[in-house]
Amino acid sequence: MQQKLIMKPSMSQTLLTRFTFNIPDIEGLFPGFKAGDFAVLYGPQSLNSLASILCVRAQLPANLGGLESNVVFIDCANSSSLSDIQFQLDAKDPLERVLNMRVYTAYRLTSLIMEKLQDAVENQDAKLVVISDIACPFLYDNVNDQEAKTVYSQIMSYLANFAKKHHIIIIATYLTHESSRRNSVLQEITTAKANTVLRFTKTLYTKEVELEKHPTYMLGVVDLTTENHALTEFMGTDKAEQNCFLM
């Protein structure tokens, strides 16, 4: 008598699932994030709208391209608002499964990431952490240059290791701060620590996405040829956000 073996998906198979932008132009270059990634997205302020949409899409079932997961969202220096979303889900509110934590200083960001992030991820059972404008508190806060460089580097290392250890995806946006004298130094640190780096650029005539760094994907540049709502402004309500304000 023959026995039929029913094979359950292994953890390694589960972790190979790709979490995409759901933007065809980008997917041809970058097939998606996977568990263990610490990714950085460089670009203009509008990039935070894209990050917000990723927070919403992560809640979708896997067969719709989501992670079936809650999300931890860290808003640095009030650079973004999850209420700027006009997006429909089969849920009462697309933000009800997002823990929104806001920080305004380098000290509070350091404390949140190093001391409180693990509890937040475990309590939320989150598979995705999104950090908006991650360098901002260190670029403009009243911290001396050497301390800012040292502590920021520690945070980047911690996030890279945290993503691998807990098998989650961490995506940080790094907005344009060309006027800050620390900007180039912190960008170098960020690029060195992240395993995935994407740069979004916009001119009067073109919109481009460049994959600057990835452990396995081929690097390159792609034009954004279609209209994508994720790169425009959104309107919505913040009633269901879970807010933690860390001054």
Predicted regions and their residues:
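Hydrophobic/aromatic beta-strand patches that form the interior of the parallel beta-sheet core
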Residues: 39-41, 72-74, 99-101, 171, ...
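P-loop NTPase motor core
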Residues: 120-192
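Short, well-ordered alpha-helix to beta-strand connector turns
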Residues: 36-37, 68, 95-98, 166, ...
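Conserved inter-motif catalytic segment of the P-loop NTP-binding fold
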Residues: 71-141
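The Walker A/P-loop phosphate-binding site
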Residues: 1-91
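Short, hydrophobic/amphipathic alpha-helical packing segments
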Residues: 52-56, 110-114, 152-157
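Localized chelating/binding microdomains
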Residues: 24, 33-52, 80, 146, ...
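Phosphate-binding/switch region of NTP-binding enzymes
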Residues: 161-247
